Structure formats: C-alpha cells, structure tokens
C-alpha cells in the first residue's frame, strides 16, 4: 500500500520476496497480515482449490507513507517454490539443492 501505483507495485514485489512465515516489522502491519491470512484460510479453498483448511501459506504486506486522499494497492501472487531456492555449488561444480531436496537441474 502506497501513494502511487509505481511504489505499490515495487512494495508488492518486495512483500512477495519476503521469507514464508516472516512478519511485518510494523505491529499494525503484522496484525493486518494475520487478519487477511486467517480470513483467506476460513473460506476453505485449500491447496490447488481442492478444499482444505490452509488456502494460503502466508500474507505479506508492505506499506509506505501516503496522503489520505490517495491509496494505491499492488497485489502479487505466486507459488513460493517458483520464486525461491537455495543451492550450494562446490568447487568441482557439483551442487546440492538445499531447499528442494531430491530435485535435479
């Protein structure tokens, strides 16, 4: 949430890249994230739309200063597995997928 669509889009991407399970540094922002996450999970869409109690893994919100007369909101969605991975590359160019065990490149 920000004062311009450009800033809102940038903050939306920043929120998307935060680690799963992280909380907003601002207490009000953290409470807002929790409220949205609980609400989304109550509708019981579930993983892949197949019903269940966990519809989202988390909700991340970033905010910037804004004027009361305008509010821009940017929303980004994405699967955590498609945007984050940890790999260890050794001197002999062998590798180990730390975050996605068993996956090969």
Question: What are the functions of these language-model segments?
Answer:
Residues 1-105:
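Non-transmembrane, aqueous-exposed alpha-helical and coiled segments at domain scale
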